[in-house]
């Protein structure tokens, strides 16, 4: 009961069913919904961490072996934590404190984003509110008992709205994030797993700030980055054809926020379907609808706006994923009912 799904992240289990980590706002708990079938008409709910304020920021990743990992913020102590599920439904779980904060006076772990290397080691990018830095935690084993903590970007207030992925070929971290000091959306491509060496690029000068960032690398290694431009009040898409996103970059304005500047098309999530089309979920705060931008061509000059759910205030904190068969799954928060929802698209266009 209460406000569940306020923050959520979706993955796919070893069986190919949706699995969602989420925050129960009233209770302050971190929970997991394990869908027991492909359409999630039946789900097992697991209580993962409680008696505090857990999971306000959370992300989930499933390794090649099917092991499930969940990164999240402990707001009571200000710590970054990682859960490793000990069975595929996460009925048993191991909790590790990765980086310690100083309570509510100084969080580490906001905007955390997790991915798993091909060797099964979790890598977590996150914002350190103590130092206002972008940080990276690299687990040195699959249990995440031991980890190396790196301050990756320390120039100004950097690391909010972070999203992380691992390069398809090199398995090295790629991080997209906000540089609030310089009012830019930035990209870092690590040259090694520990990010001792990296290339840094400015994706966009956004004059105020760029928020709600989502990153995806397709099978041809093209990078796609969606974000909200709070200056121009646009949901935007950056397409990077070169490795450092400097020489061959395209910026597309997708939708303009005409009614409520600054907060209109927020909480976006991005994937590329198995036909090579970009899909970006968004919340329309004017209509309170939840929808998708579907790109009909490579640079999204031709696009369609598709409504997914439009009864109530729905679609915040969305997370989207597709499986090897092209099926698309989206978890999102329905603030009218205070509930977590899952949508499964019946085709790769979600219409």
Q: Model-derived features: where do they sit?
A:
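Extracellular, repeat-based ectodomains that mediate carbohydrate processing or recognition
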Residues: 1-351
């Amino acid at each position: 009961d209460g406000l569940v799904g306020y923050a959520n992240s979706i993955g796919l289990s070893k069986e190919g069913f949706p699995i969602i980590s989420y925050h129960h706002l009233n209770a302050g708990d971190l929970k997991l919904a394990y869908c027991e079938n492909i359409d999630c008409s039946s789900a097992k709910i697991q209580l993962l961490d409680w008696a505090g304020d857990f999971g306000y920021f959370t992300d989930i990743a499933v390794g090649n072996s099917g092991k499930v990992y969940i990164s999240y913020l402990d707001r009571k102590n200000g710590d970054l934590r990682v859960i490793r599920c000990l069975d595929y439904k996460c009925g048993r779980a191991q909790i590790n404190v990765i980086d310690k904060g100083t309570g509510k006076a100084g969080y580490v772990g906001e905007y955390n984003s997790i991915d798993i290397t091909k060797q099964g080691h979790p890598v977590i990018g996150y914002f350190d509110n103590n130092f206002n830095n972008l940080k990276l935690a690299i687990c040195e084993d699959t249990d995440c008992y031991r980890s190396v903590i790196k301050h990756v970007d320390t120039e100004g207030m950097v690391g909010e709205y972070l999203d992380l992925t691992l390069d398809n070929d090199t398995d090295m971290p790629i991080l997209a994030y906000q540089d609030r000091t310089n009012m830019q959306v930035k990209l870092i491509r690590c040259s090694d797993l520990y990010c001792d060496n990296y290339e840094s690029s400015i994706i966009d000068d956004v004059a105020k700030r760029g928020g709600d960032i989502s990153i995806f690398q397709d099978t041809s290694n093209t990078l796609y980055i969606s974000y909200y431009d709070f200056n121009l009040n646009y949901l935007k898409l950056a397409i990077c054809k070169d490795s450092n996103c400097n020489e061959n970059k395209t910026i597309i304005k997708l939708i303009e926020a005409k009614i409520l500047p600054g907060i209109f098309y927020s909480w976006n999530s991005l994937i590329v379907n198995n036909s090579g089309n970009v899909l970006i979920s968004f919340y329309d705060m004017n209509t309170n609808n939840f929808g998708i931008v579907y790109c009909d061509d490579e640079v999204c000059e031709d696009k369609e706006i598709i409504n997914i759910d439009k009864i109530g205030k729905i679609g915040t904190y969305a997370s989207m994923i597709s499986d090897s068969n092209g099926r698309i799954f989206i978890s999102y928060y329905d603030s009218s009912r205070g509930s977590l929802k899952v949508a499964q698209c019946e085709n790769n266009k979600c219409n």
